[in-house]
A protein has these predicted regions:
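Well-ordered alpha-helical segments embedded in enzymatic catalytic cores
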Residues: 10, 59-62
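Catalytic core of membrane glycerolipid acyltransferases/transacylases, capturing the structured
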Residues: 3-54, 98, 113-114
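A conditional alpha-helix N-cap/helix-loop micro-motif detector
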Residues: 53-57, 84
Length: 169
């Protein structure tokens, strides 16, 4: 199992990229924005893991089962409420607990609708051209002494990938 990590505002277009085995399991919130995301993800054949505000332990149980099944967990480090481009989730602890490696993904399209929300979420428009860019390396959380160093590496790689993809489109 691996954790696929992408900034939240690139999320909408990136769900179209996964046509492989193992299964990709995005984490979505029970908030109404998350419910919209779930509808879109299911339409494209993904099977999201629901993060319910009142039942956080159910998500951990589902992640554990997905990890045992060899599924890939898809997570946005700056979600669900931001701030944009800052890590506010426990990716380090999650990756260590389930012995997962971390892979960076970025997405950009030439035509999109931008929401006026906390992260300026970009929704690709029909017939636009897009590009997916996977990170240069697979990040092993076991090679880091603490969460702070791991998060610094993750932010560096996410931003380097974002910068590189901006040069294409």
């Amino acid at each position: 199992s691996v954790l696929v990590v992408i900034w939240h505002n690139q999320l909408m277009g990136s769900t179209f990229s996964w046509k492989f085995k193992p299964k990709l399991r995005p984490i979505a919130t029970s908030h109404r924005d998350g419910q919209l995301s779930i509808l879109v993800q299911k339409k494209f054949g993904l099977d999201p893991l629901l993060r319910e505000k009142n039942k956080p332990s159910s998500l951990i149980k589902n992640i554990s089962q997905a990890s045992k099944n060899g599924d890939c967990i898809y997570i946005t480090p700056d979600a669900p409420h931001g701030p944009r481009y800052e890590i506010n989730t426990n990716i380090y602890k999650l990756a260590l607990k389930y012995d997962m490696r971390v892979i960076i993904l970025s997405f950009k399209t030439n035509k999109f609708f931008k929401l006026n929300n906390w992260d300026k979420l970009k929704i690709p428009l029909p017939f636009s051209k897009g590009i997916y860019l996977w990170g240069k390396e697979i990040i092993d959380p076991n090679k880091f002494s603490d969460e702070e160093n791991f998060n610094a590496k993750l932010i560096f790689e996410l931003n380097a990938n974002k910068k590189m993809i901006n040069e294409y489109i």
